[in-house]
């Protein structure tokens, strides 16, 4: 922020009465006409496109975007999303519509860590790895906010601060107990990067407590860490109705006045909810100072000024046209993002791609074959057109191939029709399979099965999954259709890891499409028939069941994610196949020995030996050879996305900085130790399971750091 806008905000707030200041701290902020301040609603959503505000381009859900491992793509998508948001805001404002979801302060991205595959909101995140989450979160923020901090196109918000990833059912009362090691090693890293590197404008506090303190009123989180350690200068907003949880569920305050005061005094500037309507009474009771109120409102006015909401500080984006909303270029990018997000989990005997010239009939079967809900996930906008996998296949093959559809079963119930018998669509599915040359079986989840507390609508626990199996009758449908004996391709639509152990053993081809966006069925069809080669990578670990996972409520990282366990892994983090082969060779570094704080650059040659152009994500992992018990193994510390034409070879280099070699100590310190480090560079995570699935080894280099143990900035 500039000195000009900061002084403007101070001058503006100095003219407000105390009551006017307090009125601006609720998400439905009223106009102050005598000061030229228009009404504004701060609650706006843009997780993977402008959401809940009518028509907009609907991109793949965040977890699918994470599977691209591509920072450049995420920034480009963020730029498109804020362009559409700004275009809509411009037109809505001209017509006097300042309602909810029609503003410029977008409460995205979600940079929580998907630490447990049962968490219902995990598909809103960028996966289980702090480094990947930080890199992609920063890229999306840069795209949303634009290049000029004094004139942002929109304001992004990193959420939910902090240590927040389920269980959904008890999020309003839950106390996440976490060690300093895990706090800094896992839960805070992406937020730090969003603040320091991407200059995110806002941070949203979480519902839960962290080590006894409610997150939206935590001195430790909001003052000591966010403001003092991270140097955050933007505004803090509460999650919706989180502040009333202080007294109603957490029982750390006695009443709403105490709750509102605790939040405001500890640095929460804006309340999504009603608690701050009680700030006047809290002030009367001596619970909150005018200084705290003034500081909060100055921060809120400052970003509104920079966004161009005051007449004498115009925005360069105020003429963006509504014609840009869901324009062809934006839709094309959404489909390209869907293509880039597809992860090929299995392709036995090169079953894929299918040869349309050799197929006369295709059976498209499953509850997600023609489901719009399975395209979009949650926090989604409205598209003017949807293309499901069934529709994508029909459009691709045209009249040359007979496409038969059967729902097969309900997503999670035992029957489709209310008055029907159990398995009332099974026989139809079997008949369709029997009459087809090949079966495309579309199974998985949607946001009614995995989602947010209060939004998910079935028997699962308030949005969280009870386990990792396909729900309802889907597993039985999978086995029944496979038993018909026709070639089967399993297309998975889900925002999280599913236990596909049976499918891995019995189904020849498996494609994970995540929630691929409004027109994602087009990308699915093109992948199946070989218009392009899927080449996404898993941003989460796929486990064989939950037997070896810790309790869901245990926030220790021991036994969780690829960084802290290698037990019962079906598909590893960073894994993904493609059509043909990508080879790596000649890994090297010129800094085999270096000082503790020196950078290390690693290089490798990458060759596309397939017949398709590819975007390959080169993954770099680092491990300290003498790691102590409780410290992680190999960790992702570098990504390079390289575009390769068929047959093309390129040399790729990645520079690792001192922080990439650091470990977090028990007391939360960040240190680089002298000694030997292993660096893996390749197209996958190092390890036995990756090697077994791909048939490839990753090249591992050893470098030595010399000198004394050094502290580095977290």
PLM regions with names:
Residues 689-713:
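Short beta-strand elements
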């Amino acid at each position: 922020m500039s000195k000009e806008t900061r002084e403007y905000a101070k001058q503006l707030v100095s003219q407000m009465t105390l009551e006017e200041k307090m009125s601006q701290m609720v998400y439905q902020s009223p106009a102050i006409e005598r000061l030229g301040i228009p009404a504004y609603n701060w609650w706006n959503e843009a997780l993977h496109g402008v959401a809940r505000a009518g028509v907009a381009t609907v991109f793949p859900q965040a977890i699918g975007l994470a599977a691209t491992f591509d920072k450049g793509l995420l920034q480009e998508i963020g730029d498109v999303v804020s362009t559409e948001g700004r275009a809509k805001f411009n037109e809505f404002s001209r017509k006097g519509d300042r309602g909810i979801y029609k503003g410029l302060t977008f409460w995205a991205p979600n940079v929580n860590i998907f630490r447990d595959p049962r968490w219902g909101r995990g598909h809103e995140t960028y996966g289980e790895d702090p480094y990947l989450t930080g890199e992609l979160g920063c890229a999306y923020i840069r795209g949303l906010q634009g290049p000029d901090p004094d004139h942002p196109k929109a304001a992004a918000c990193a959420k939910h601060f902090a240590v927040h990833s389920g269980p959904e059912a008890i999020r309003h009362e839950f106390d996440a107990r976490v060690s300093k090691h895990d706090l800094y090693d896992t839960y805070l890293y992406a937020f730090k990067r969003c603040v320091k590197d991407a200059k995110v404008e806002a941070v949203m506090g979480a519902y839960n407590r962290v080590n006894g303190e409610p997150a939206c009123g935590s001195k430790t989180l909001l003052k000591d860490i966010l403001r003092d350690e991270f140097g955050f200068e933007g505004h803090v907003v509460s999650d919706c109705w989180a502040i009333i949880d202080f007294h109603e569920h957490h029982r750390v305050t006695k009443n709403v006045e105490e709750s509102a005061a605790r939040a405001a005094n500890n640095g929460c500037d804006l309340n999504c909810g009603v608690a701050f309507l009680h700030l006047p009474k809290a002030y009367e009771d001596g619970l909150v100072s005018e200084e705290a109120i003034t500081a909060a409102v100055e921060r809120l006015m400052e970003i509104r000024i920079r966004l161009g909401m005051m007449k004498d500080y115009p925005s360069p984006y105020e003429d963006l046209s509504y014609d840009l909303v869901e324009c062809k270029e934006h839709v094309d990018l959404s489909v390209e993002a869907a293509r880039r997000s597809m992860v090929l989990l299995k392709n036995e005997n090169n079953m894929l791609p299918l040869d349309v010239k050799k197929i006369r009939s295709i059976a498209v079967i499953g509850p997600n074959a023609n489901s719009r809900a399975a395209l979009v996930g949650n926090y989604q906008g409205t598209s003017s057109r949807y293309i499901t996998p069934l529709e994508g296949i029909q459009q691709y093959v045209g009249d040359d191939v007979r496409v038969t559809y059967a729902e097969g079963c309900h997503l999670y119930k035992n029957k489709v029709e209310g008055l029907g018998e159990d398995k009332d669509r099974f026989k139809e599915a079997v008949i369709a399979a029997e009459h087809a040359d090949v079966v495309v079986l579309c199974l998985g989840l949607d946001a009614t099965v995995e989602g947010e507390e209060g939004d998910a609508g079935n028997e699962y626990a308030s949005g969280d999954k009870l386990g990792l199996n396909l729900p309802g009758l889907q597993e039985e449908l999978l086995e029944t259709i496979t038993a018909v004996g026709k070639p089967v391709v399993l297309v998975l639509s889900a925002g999280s890891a599913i236990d596909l152990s049976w499918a891995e053993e019995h189904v020849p081809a498996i494609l994970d499409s995540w929630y691929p966006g409004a027109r994602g069925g087009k990308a699915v069809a093109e992948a199946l028939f070989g218009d392009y080669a899927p080449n996404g990578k898993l941003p989460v670990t796929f486990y064989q069941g939950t037997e070896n996972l810790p309790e869901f409520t245990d926030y220790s990282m021991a036994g969780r994610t690829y960084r802290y366990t290698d037990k019962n892994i079906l598909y590893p983090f960073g894994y993904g196949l493609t059509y043909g082969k990508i080879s790596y060779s000649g890994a090297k570094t010129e800094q085999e020995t270096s000082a503790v704080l020196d950078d290390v650059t690693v290089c490798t040659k990458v060759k596309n030996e397939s017949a398709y152009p590819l975007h390959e994500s080169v993954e770099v992992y680092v491990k300290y050879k003498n790691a102590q018990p409780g410290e992680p193994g190999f960790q992702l510390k570098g990504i390079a996305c390289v575009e390769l034409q068929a047959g093309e070879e390129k040399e790729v280099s990645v520079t690792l900085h001192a922080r990439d070699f650091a470990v977090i100590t028990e007391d939360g310190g960040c240190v680089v130790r002298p000694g030997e480090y292993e660096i893996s560079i390749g197209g996958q995570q190092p390890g036995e399971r990756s090697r077994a699935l791909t048939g490839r080894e990753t090249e591992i280099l050893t470098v030595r750091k010399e000198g004394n143990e050094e502290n580095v900035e977290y």
